[in-house]
């Protein structure tokens, strides 16, 4: 049986990972080891580990790493604390693989510790571009530390290969969030209009906001 360690640090990436977590948990040949860290354990961000427990994942490792600071120094220190915690967890669990998604510094810490433990890393959503943001440097650094790569598009797959990764280790599988779309129970038009208090027959503009 293979020990698969999956790391989650925020609600955003947990929502994408959830279908995969269920698959691993149900697989007779795999043993899921979930590591919950970062914002999930912070009162400032709503203690969202409780949502993970409500989904049935009640047994997991906790890695307390988030300092109450939004400075660059605080972020760097949080990453350092996180790396120490991940190293201790990996030493105890001895996973066969670490699965990570995205480009946050919590995930960078998880990847760096796994690499130094020579644990294979499976990285989801590599090869993407976020120009002008630190996310891009973190994402590409994680790519270079990883063994297996699961990209959302063929363009991203080619970018990972251009970075020197072996083509047979880079797989274009689509966006993981599609699994949620396939299973999501959608509102009908009438319910949607009622929930937002607005008729979709009227002209409208949809704006999304992604804070830096």
Spans of features found by a protein language model:
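A nucleotide-sugar donor-handling region in carbohydrate enzymes
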Residues: 7, 41-43, 146-211
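Conserved nucleotide-sugar phosphate-binding/catalytic loop shared by glycosyltransferases and other
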Residues: 32-75
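PLP-dependent amino-acid enzyme catalytic core
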Residues: 1, 25-27, 61, 73-80, ...
């Amino acid at each position: 049986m293979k020990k698969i360690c999956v790391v989650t640090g925020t609600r955003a990436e947990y929502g994408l990972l959830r279908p995969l977590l269920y698959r691993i948990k149900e697989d007779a040949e795999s043993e899921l080891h979930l590591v919950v860290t970062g914002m999930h354990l912070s009162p400032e961000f709503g203690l969202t580990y409780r949502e993970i427990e409500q989904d049935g994942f009640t047994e997991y490792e906790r890695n307390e790493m988030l300092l109450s600071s939004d400075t660059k120094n605080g972020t760097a220190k949080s990453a350092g604390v996180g790396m120490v915690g991940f190293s201790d967890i990996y030493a105890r669990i001895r996973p066969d693989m670490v699965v990570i998604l995205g480009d946050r510094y919590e995930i960078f810490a998880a990847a760096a510790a796994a690499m130094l433990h020579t644990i294979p890393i499976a990285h989801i959503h590599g090869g993407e571009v976020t120009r002008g943001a630190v996310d891009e440097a973190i994402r590409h650094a994680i790519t270079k530390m990883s063994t297996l790569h699961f990209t959302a598009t063929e363009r991203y797959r080619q970018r990972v290969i251009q970075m020197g990764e072996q083509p047979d280790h880079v797989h274009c599988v689509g966006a993981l969030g599609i699994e949620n779309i396939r299973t999501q129970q959608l509102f009908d038009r009438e319910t949607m209009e009622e929930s937002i208090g607005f008729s979709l027959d009227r002209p409208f503009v949809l704006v999304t906001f992604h804070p830096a």
